[in-house]
């Protein structure tokens, strides 16, 4: 039995949906446009923006790559965001983080129009999300839920344990599992008896950024194991789960790379295709 939950495979299907949708739009004389803002020249952010651009272009989405000097003032960055908010041709805005230290990240992200906030960064977007109102879904948590559903893994009534309580993954994922009627426990650095808690999980999600932290002693026989973490070890991308050690014990498991991360950018671009939700 193949135990691998492949984000790459699921992403291929979603890309096909996006491509068909944008082709229909263009046939009617319409198009979608995303503006991606990069401040400075952080290597990881440059790579990610280029990857976004390539994927968007392949899927028929117009992509505006905005590169701003690292020394730009906070006021001028805010003016740029306000300009994009008012531009009716722009359907989605992405602001790559982190920002330079002299810029107040919270003040800037809160300026992004919630109806264009593809990454769900602003407090208005976050508020809509937690109140269950219509909004763009946070992409990494959405990737976890999308992957489970694509493989017809039952969530309702299941015991879910999430290791990690970040604002980007752990907290919104907790809410999304609640919305699916799971019983959810969130663990963190102060959790006592972590192994015992993890062993209760039907679905174990790990998002802490510590390479190979979770071994088979944390996993109950037959659990579904979702690895969200990415770290570089000896030049290779590695997850939070010791894949080789856990594989035999899990019923299904995500690889790193090739699992959750393979879906995130695709779902980010799907966000702008509102009719596909």
Curated annotation (Swiss-Prot):
Pfam families: THF_DHG_CYH (PF00763), THF_DHG_CYH_C (PF02882)
Binding site for NADP(+): 164-166, 189, 230
Annotated S-S bridges: none
Lineage: superkingdom: Bacteria
Reactions accelerated catalytically: (6R)-5,10-methylene-5,6,7,8-tetrahydrofolate + NADP(+) = (6R)-5,10-methenyltetrahydrofolate + NADPH; (6R)-5,10-methenyltetrahydrofolate + H2O = (6R)-10-formyltetrahydrofolate + H(+)
GO CC terms: cytosol
Keywords in alphabetical order: Amino-acid biosynthesis, Histidine biosynthesis, Hydrolase, Methionine biosynthesis, Multifunctional enzyme, NADP, One-carbon metabolism, Oxidoreductase, Purine biosynthesis
Pathway of action: One-carbon metabolism; tetrahydrofolate interconversion
Single Gene Ontology MF annotation: methylenetetrahydrofolate dehydrogenase (NADP+) activity
Function statement: Catalyzes the oxidation of 5,10-methylenetetrahydrofolate to 5,10-methenyltetrahydrofolate and then the hydrolysis of 5,10-methenyltetrahydrofolate to 10-formyltetrahydrofolate.
Protein name: Bifunctional protein FolD
Source organism per UniProt: Clostridium perfringens (strain 13 / Type A)
